[in-house]
């Protein structure tokens, strides 16, 4: 008995300095126990390795079998301290995530500030699978605002990797949109940096603040520009204040309005204010979807005025495709007001002027007024009724009001002169009718000429009325 007990102390038979092949360990109680424990440990380690392999390969049935064996816990930790649920989330296996959660896995587990939700949002997989995993974790009360060591939250990872639906889901569960990481990046900044246009649009709709700067003082728009994402740069520069939760882009009419009301081209290399001011060239190209040509044209010192007067060979020389040229030409037609050669009026005013020439002049004048009326109608329709909705940087409204007053005065003068012209023509017509030597013109010609004169007078008066409305509109601003 005593001998047996002594043997249980595992004393080396050959002493501490024994150099025998087996170190002099006696084959007895201790060796038998050690062999027994070794035999038990080996299957556990093998099962753990098999379990990890099943997790990473998505073998759901094997995972369930090993969990049912009771040897491996649902919250067991592997190398680096990861749990089975974290492994499943890292490969975006929604079915495995559901199985583990149903068996009681902790959805709020974290290792070195790395949460399972962050792991799921940054997983390599389809957005559909990632969305399902995130939805499952959120349903088990995973906190969407817990940040990693770099202070990045799940929504930042989702925005960085371009998962639009995941971003929306996180916000719906209380994720903070404007949280900043250690470098001052928000989810919007990450999306702008990586060129995720759909994410940028979604975040702006969800209330992301595009004016939050990084630690080095950069706006999301500037981050996008630095990384050559020019379309996102334009979106972030031309949208309304995103804190209102709305996304509005420049329309064609707003672009035209900007061109008509600006004085000269401006450079945009300064730090942007809350409503970034852009030169005419940038605004014009953006409105036509040609913002990708901005940098090239600016490098060649091509102004908007030069662009609008380019010939076909110049367009080709400067890298414009036929499709781009067509866009610009179409826009020019919409902006074009037909020019009348008023220098010829001195000749037409002579008594030798023919009826056809004079009628042609009246038709041109009438068409000119029609173009002007259409332009004013378009601007009145597109002008925002609320000053908060003004996208572009405007000068003082007093400047616009004073110009409108001058326009109204000019239209009134024009209306008066046209009325004088009408009276003069009517007088001439009456005198000719009373002249016994005059051969009467055909009735239809006389009626048609009278109709043209009436239409011209009505058009001019209508133009004056529209400008009066425009003046009242600006006075309200």
From Swiss-Prot:
InterPro entries (alphabetical): Ankyrin_rpt (IPR002110), Ankyrin_rpt-contain_sf (IPR036770), Asz1_SAM (IPR042650), SAM (IPR001660), SAM/pointed_sf (IPR013761)
Record keywords, A-Z: ANK repeat, Cytoplasm, Developmental protein, Differentiation, Meiosis, Phosphoprotein, Repeat, RNA-mediated gene silencing, Spermatogenesis
Localization (cell): Cytoplasm
Gene Ontology BP terms: cell differentiation; male meiotic nuclear division; regulatory ncRNA-mediated gene silencing; spermatogenesis; transposable element silencing
Location of Phosphoserine modifications: 17-18, 20
Assembly: Interacts with DDX4, PIWIL1, RANBP9 and TDRD1.
Biological role: Plays a central role during spermatogenesis by repressing transposable elements and preventing their mobilization, which is essential for the germline integrity. Acts via the piRNA metabolic process, which mediates the repression of transposable elements during meiosis by forming complexes composed of piRNAs and Piwi proteins and governs the methylation and subsequent repression of transposons. Its association with pi-bodies suggests a participation in the primary piRNAs metabolic process.
Protein name as it appears in the record: Ankyrin repeat, SAM and basic leucine zipper domain-containing protein 1
Organism of provenance: Ateles geoffroyi (Black-handed spider monkey)
């Amino acid at each position: 008995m005593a001998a047996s007990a002594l043997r249980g102390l595992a004393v080396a038979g050959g002493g501490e300095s024994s150099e025998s092949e087996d170190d002099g360990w006696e084959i007895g109680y201790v060796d038998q126990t050690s062999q027994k424990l070794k035999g038990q440990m080996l299957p556990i380690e093998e099962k753990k390795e098999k379990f990890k392999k099943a997790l990473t390969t998505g073998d759901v049935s094997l995972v369930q079998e090993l969990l049912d064996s009771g040897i491996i816990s649902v919250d067991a930790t592997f190398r680096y301290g990861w749990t089975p649920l974290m492994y499943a989330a890292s490969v975006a296996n929604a079915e495995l995530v559901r199985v583990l959660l149903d068996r009681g896995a902790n959805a709020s587990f974290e290792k070195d500030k790395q949460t399972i939700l962050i792991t799921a949002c940054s997983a390599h997989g389809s957005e559909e699978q990632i969305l399902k995993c995130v939805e499952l974790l959120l349903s088990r009360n995973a906190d969407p605002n817990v940040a990693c060591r770099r202070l990045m939250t799940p929504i930042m990872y989702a925005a960085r990797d371009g998962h639009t639906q995941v971003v929306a889901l996180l916000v719906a569960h209380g994720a903070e949109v404007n949280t900043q990481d250690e470098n001052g990046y928000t989810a919007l900044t990450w999306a702008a940096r990586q060129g995720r246009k759909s994410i940028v649009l979604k975040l702006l709709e969800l209330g992301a603040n595009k004016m939050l700067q990084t630690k080095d003082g950069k706006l999301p728009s500037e981050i996008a520009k630095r990384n050559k994402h020019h379309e996102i740069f334009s979106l972030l520069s031309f949208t309304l204040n995103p804190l209102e939760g709305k996304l509005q882009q420049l329309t064609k009419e707003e672009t035209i309005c900007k061109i008509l009301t600006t004085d000269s081209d401006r450079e945009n290399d300064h730090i942007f204010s809350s409503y970034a001011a852009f030169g005419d060239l940038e605004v014009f190209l953006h409105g036509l979807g040609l913002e990708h040509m901005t940098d090239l044209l600016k490098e060649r010192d091509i102004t908007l005025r030069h662009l609008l007067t380019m010939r076909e060979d110049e367009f080709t020389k400067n890298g414009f495709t036929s499709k781009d040229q067509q866009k610009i030409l179409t826009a020019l037609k919409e902006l074009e007001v037909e020019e009348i050669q008023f220098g010829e009026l001195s000749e037409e005013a002579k008594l030798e002027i023919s009826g056809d020439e004079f009628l042609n002049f009246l038709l041109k004048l009438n068409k000119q007024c029609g173009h002007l009326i259409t332009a004013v109608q378009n601007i009145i329709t597109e002008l925002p009724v609320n000053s908060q909705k003004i996208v572009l940087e405007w000068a003082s409204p007093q400047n616009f009001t004073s110009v409108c007053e001058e326009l109204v005065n000019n239209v009134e003068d024009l209306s008066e002169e046209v009325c004088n012209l009408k009276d003069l023509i009517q007088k001439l017509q009456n005198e000719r009718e009373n002249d016994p030597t005059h051969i009467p013109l055909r009735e239809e010609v006389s009626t048609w000429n009278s109709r043209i004169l009436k239409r011209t007078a009505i058009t001019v008066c209508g133009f004056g009325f529209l400008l009066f409305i425009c003046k009242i509109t600006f006075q309200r601003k």
